[in-house]
């Protein structure tokens, strides 16, 4: 059975996935996979093609480079705070990442008023043009399966079944928490709409002003990839 430490870890990992989903909803709204963000999309070239094969033909985006890198880095924090690195530990860390990625992604749909569980289905999500099994895209099953394989390899490397057993119990705990979130999601949807009701937003009374050179980020046309010279910086006032 799962002990108190593992229960706490499962709750913390779920809370992390929940917050990742929540912040992405605030950033993206109903337009997932960075569809309307000022980032780049890459499907061509060796990197774009390989990524597409591994990720169900989805484009690699600048947003997702960092969105995926941050959880991987955070999960490795224990190794620089005194926990000894081992192959079994690394495999366990990667197993946790793939589970978190699935939970985080699904919660984005559960909590997002533009989708909800009812509207999360085949043909309604352009970046999930992959086979679906029941109500879920194949990517979710492959992500969970990969995490179990990694946990099994961790157990084999450690010569101890506990990494696999612990991982399986974590999956059970996360499944229960996801189910509870599905049931309670209407409360989040209500709060989401409440914060956006007419007259509630204080953007119009908040003093804002544009950046010095918004065109330097992206003007919607061909990007200027030439390096800035000293004269360019002086003319722009930077």
Kindly give the residue locations of the regions a language model identified.
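A cross-taxon signal for low-complexity, glycine/charged-rich
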Residues: 230-231, 235
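Compact soluble domain cores
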Residues: 238
């Amino acid at each position: 059975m799962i002990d108190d430490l593992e229960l706490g870890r499962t709750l913390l990992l779920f809370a992390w996935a929940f917050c990742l989903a929540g912040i992405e909803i605030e950033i993206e709204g109903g337009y997932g996979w960075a569809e309307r963000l000022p980032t780049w999309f890459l499907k061509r070239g060796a990197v774009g093609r390989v990524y597409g094969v591994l990720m169900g033909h989805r484009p690699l985006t600048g947003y997702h480079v960092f969105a995926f890198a941050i959880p991987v880095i955070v999960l490795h924090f224990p190794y620089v705070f005194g926990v000894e690195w081992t192959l079994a530990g690394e495999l366990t860390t990667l197993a946790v990442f793939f589970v978190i990625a699935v939970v985080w992604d699904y919660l984005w749909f559960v909590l997002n008023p533009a989708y909800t569980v009812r509207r999360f289905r085949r043909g309604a999500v352009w970046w999930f043009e992959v086979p679906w099994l029941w109500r879920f895209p194949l990517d979710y099953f492959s992500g969970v399966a990969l995490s179990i394989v990694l946990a099994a390899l961790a157990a084999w490397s450690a010569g101890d079944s506990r990494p696999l057993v612990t991982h399986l119990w974590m999956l059970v705990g996360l499944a229960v928490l996801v189910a509870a979130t599905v049931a309670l999601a209407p409360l989040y949807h209500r709060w989401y709409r409440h914060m956006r009701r007419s007259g509630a937003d204080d953007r119009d009374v908040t003093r804002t002003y544009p950046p010095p050179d918004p065109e330097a980020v992206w003007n919607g046309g061909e990007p200027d990839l030439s390096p800035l010279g000293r004269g360019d910086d002086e003319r722009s006032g930077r």
